[in-house]
Amino acid sequence: MKTNPIKLEKKLKLKFSDQKIFIKSLTHKSFDSINNNEKIEFLGDRVLGLIIAKKLLELYPDEKEGVLDKKFASLVNKKKCLEIAKKIELEKYILVLNPKNKKIEIEDKIVADCLEALIGAIYLDKGLNFTERFILNLWSEHITASVITQIDAKTKLQEYSLKIFKVLPIYKLISNTGPRHKPLFKVAVKLKNTKFFTAEGTSKKDAEQNAASLCLQDIFKK
């Protein structure tokens, strides 16, 4: 059994005027093939992007576009959405098909997508200003902690590999899935003496950065 959605409203200090759109934002297509959260997720993804982009411009008015773009990608990707969704325990409230009524573990992508759907529902019910406050409240510590060292992971890994092994890192595209408007890339990277490190991203470039970051973490923890 799922936890009552009203508890989620109380936890997040929300009060939806339209309860139907709130429940819809928590409904996966496996539970209801018609009234599910796919389209609201599409909207929520755009609203999240708008708010984060606006905040980054306010914080870094003189920063180069390329750096802003990478900061942006690190704040709106699936990994970050999942991290925030887990923090508010969103997975407890998602409606998914469970024919045997057993305790199941919901896929990470479904949880991350549901957070975007919830954002879309808040926007439709409360408007942009309220949604902006909601997003910035959840993302504030992540925005201030967005560090350039992680953004430049691919460059750092390349420099390390050339210095130590005299060859470039090897990147391999594992998969490209998801709908056209919301692709999900999986990329693996390895150095001459390492295993492959795999990560995902909303673009191939983003996935490569995330994989490079994992590889660097492994190198420097030794």
From Swiss-Prot:
Q: Which residues form the RNase III domain?
A: 5-127
**Required cofactor(s):** Mg(2+)
Signal peptide per UniProt: none
KW tRNA processing (keyword) present: yes
Active-site residues annotated for this sequence: 45, 116
Q: Name one Pfam family in it.
A: Ribonucleas_3_3
Which UniProt keyword terms apply here?
Cytoplasm, Endonuclease, Hydrolase, Magnesium, Metal-binding, mRNA processing, Nuclease, RNA-binding, rRNA processing, rRNA-binding, tRNA processing
Q: Its Gene Ontology biological processes? A: mRNA processing; regulation of gene expression; rRNA processing; tRNA processing
Which EC number applies? 3.1.26.3
GO CC aspect terms? cytoplasm
Keyword Kinase on entry: no
Give the UniProt subcellular location, in the record's own words: Cytoplasm
What InterPro entries does UniProt report for this protein, alphabetically? dsRBD_dom, RNase_III, RNase_III_dom, RNase_III_sf
Q: Where is the DRBM domain?
A: 152-221
MF terms from GO for this chain are: double-stranded RNA binding; metal ion binding; ribonuclease III activity; rRNA binding
Q: Which reactions does this protein catalyse?
A: Endonucleolytic cleavage to 5'-phosphomonoester
Q: Where does Mg(2+) bind?
A: 41, 113, 116
Q: Its family?
A: Belongs to the ribonuclease III family.
Q: Which HAMAP family match?
A: RNase_III (MF_00104)
Its annotated function is as follows: Digests double-stranded RNA. Involved in the processing of primary rRNA transcript to yield the immediate precursors to the large and small rRNAs (23S and 16S). Processes some mRNAs, and tRNAs when they are encoded in the rRNA operon. Processes pre-crRNA and tracrRNA of type II CRISPR loci if present in the organism.
The record's subunit annotation is:
Homodimer.
Q: State the protein's name.
A: Ribonuclease 3
Q: Which organism is it from?
A: Pelagibacter ubique (strain HTCC1062)
Name of encoding gene? rnc
